[in-house]
């Protein structure tokens, strides 16, 4: 079980289609010559800019705001506590998550909701979920427009449902996601080939000059990392893997030593048994 958990951690985000092409964008602020720690919070318009400026290298890119746990209601009854993300229709092609039903472009519409297969089963049993109304926290109605395949537990960016930024802006009366001030979004990029990553990273500074005015005392650098690498570089992830690996090997060592000790402890009894058989006239082949 310990090694199974280690394997679970090491296989984070291997679920996505062609995971070697999927990358998380990291932003590093350089202020007064000092580099800050890279963070995964980015500008709301960054994915669209990357798609526009690097069409040959980038297959798709999307913005995700992760995540809120919300109570979902159907026909007045609380049905499920679910993790909901805010994104755009690019989310499925970028992450490589299979859409089972519905038109992906409808996710960008007001009050449209896409839900996972297991959430659809939980909410509506075997009934067709398309067109059904779901309430978020009993005060905001959304219409199910599509169903996507479940995202497994060992995924860094796991959600049960997703709705658009247009919907969130209407729900909270708050339009966000520009080039200034609100730098709190996850930017995921799917490259056409892994070798394109360094090319794009090298050209990011020139691209950003189109949108933000930097100076020698303050500017930003951008880099890319796979979701799996992002997960494994976290202190808590490394700690879990190290502790469980040490415990696992310790248990194996103790079990091995126990077997050796049991064998050694049985030697006197074995020798006594051999002696008795010898005294009784048994030959070597009969012992």
Predicted regions and their residues:
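Hydrophobic alpha-helical transmembrane segments of multipass integral membrane proteins
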Residues: 2, 249-256
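Structured, solvent-exposed hinge/loop segments at the ends of secondary-structure elements
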Residues: 2-130, 136-143, 202, 209-213
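Juxtamembrane transmembrane-helix termini
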Residues: 7-17, 152, 261-264, 268
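Membrane-helix interface segments
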Residues: 57, 78-79, 196, 237-239, ...
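Mid-to-C-terminal secondary-structure elements
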Residues: 85-101, 113-237
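Exposed loop/turn and edge beta-strand positions of beta-sandwich/beta-sheet ligand-binding modules
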Residues: 109, 138, 183-185, 258, ...
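N-terminal membrane-entry
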Residues: 234-251
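Intracellular coupling helices
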Residues: 257-287
């Amino acid at each position: 079980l310990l090694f199974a958990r280690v394997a679970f951690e090491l296989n984070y985000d291997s679920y996505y289609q062609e995971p070697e092409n999927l990358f998380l964008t990291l932003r590093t602020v350089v202020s007064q010559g000092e580099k800050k720690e890279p963070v995964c919070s980015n500008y709301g318009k960054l994915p669209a800019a990357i798609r526009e400026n690097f069409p040959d290298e980038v297959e798709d890119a999307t913005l995700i705001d992760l995540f809120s746990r919300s109570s979902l209601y159907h026909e007045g009854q609380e049905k499920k506590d679910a993790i909901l993300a805010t994104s755009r229709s690019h989310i499925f092609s970028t992450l490589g998550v299979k859409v089972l039903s519905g038109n992906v472009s409808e996710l960008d519409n007001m009050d449209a909701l896409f839900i996972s297969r297991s959430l659809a089963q939980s909410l509506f049993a075997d009934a067709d979920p398309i067109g059904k109304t779901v309430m978020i926290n009993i005060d905001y109605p959304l219409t199910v427009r599509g169903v996507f395949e479940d995202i497994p537990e060992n995924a860094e960016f796991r959600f049960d449902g997703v709705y658009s930024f247009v919907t969130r802006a209407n729900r909270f009366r708050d339009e966000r996601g520009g080039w200034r001030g609100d730098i709190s979004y996850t930017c995921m990029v799917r490259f056409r080939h892994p070798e394109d990553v360094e090319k794009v990273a090298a050209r990011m500074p020139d691209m950003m000059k189109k949108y933000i005015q930097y100076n020698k005392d303050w500017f930003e650098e951008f880099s890319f990392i796979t979701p799996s690498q992002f997960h494994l570089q976290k202190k808590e992830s490394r700690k879990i893997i190290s502790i469980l690996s040490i415990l696992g090997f310790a248990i194996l060592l103790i079990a091995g030593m126990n077997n050796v000790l049991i064998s050694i402890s049985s030697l006197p009894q074995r020798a006594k048994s051999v002696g008795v058989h010898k005294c009784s006239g048994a030959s070597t082949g009969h012992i």
